[in-house]
């Protein structure tokens, strides 16, 4: 087998327009990329613009490029849902016909009672659906006084445990999350998330010591099939957590987008074969959920400036794809994810550019990765043959 690389950059939550069923999710009119551009008076994305991202949705400041240097399209989500797990799983061939479990009114006693019993905790604070930054602001001081963790959920399938790093050691917080993960498996909750924070009342901030504990996939992913075929898979950022480390041969923790982009660039100097699968979380975590279009715009422009250094590492015959896992429109009243198309911008050195159209599933990306490495996979439709000779 030729030694070559396929790079996936997931710009977490950078959707590009509402899906036809967005109304059913309360997301009609969402367009993370387009609405952000208009909210800030225009975006400066010269690299992505030349690659053709302006063809995907109207972006103020980024007109459609008549002769794009990359292949461009968008992907629709076939799975039911609009969360991180659902989006990433579908990319790698797992399409969910039923959404993962939600608990909009908080978690019932049959979940919390065994959690308290096994952890030895006297109780929890919160147990509501809430914005993470808001509930930490509201309950952080009481948490520090009592030692009881803050438990909350959201519009996603998540059980989140927040604790101050000076009140609860990180390893204790992670141990609590492992207990919750085991209890929640039968309930089909996608993720248990450790949400550590620091600071003092009124000035609490979450840290990059976050850790996700994901439910196991209901089938085998493209990642596992690659590893079976002895193709290395490097997960960067929260990718290993999302797939419960199955189908991952190496991993790199990151502390935000700038760190993730720099580590990806450095990684390509030492990895000469395999899949490099990267999640850039700041779009979602710092700006989408906080309804901060200015911050979102700055993060997009930061990524655009970094792309040439990453794409310049690729050799002829290799591929890099930029995409997203869902939307999180910072201009809407909601602070939750949005049901959107996601971008598909593909750089293949020496192959030019063109349109990939609207893909019927995120799984087309995984099918293309499998095709690229000569691995058999049934879900999705590969676009490798559309990338030119």
From Swiss-Prot:
The chemistry this enzyme catalyses reads:
2-deoxy-alpha-D-ribose 1-phosphate = 2-deoxy-D-ribose 5-phosphate; alpha-D-ribose 1-phosphate = D-ribose 5-phosphate
One annotated GO biological process: nucleotide metabolic process
Write out the GO cellular component annotations: cytosol
Stated EC number for the protein is: 5.4.2.7
- CDD domains the record matches: PPM (cd16009)
Positions contributing to Mn(2+) 1 binding: 12, 325-326
Pathway(s) this gene product operates in, as recorded in its UniProt entry: Carbohydrate degradation; 2-deoxy-D-ribose 1-phosphate degradation; D-glyceraldehyde 3-phosphate and acetaldehyde from 2-deoxy-alpha-D-ribose 1-phosphate: step 1/2
Names of required cofactors: Mn(2+)
- Residue positions binding Mn(2+) 2: 284, 289, 337
HAMAP family assigned to the protein according to its UniProt record, in alphabetical order: Phosphopentomut
- What family does the database annotate? Belongs to the phosphopentomutase family.
| Name of protein | Phosphopentomutase
What's the source species for this entry? Anaeromyxobacter sp. (strain Fw109-5)
Question: Gene that codes for this?
Answer: deoB
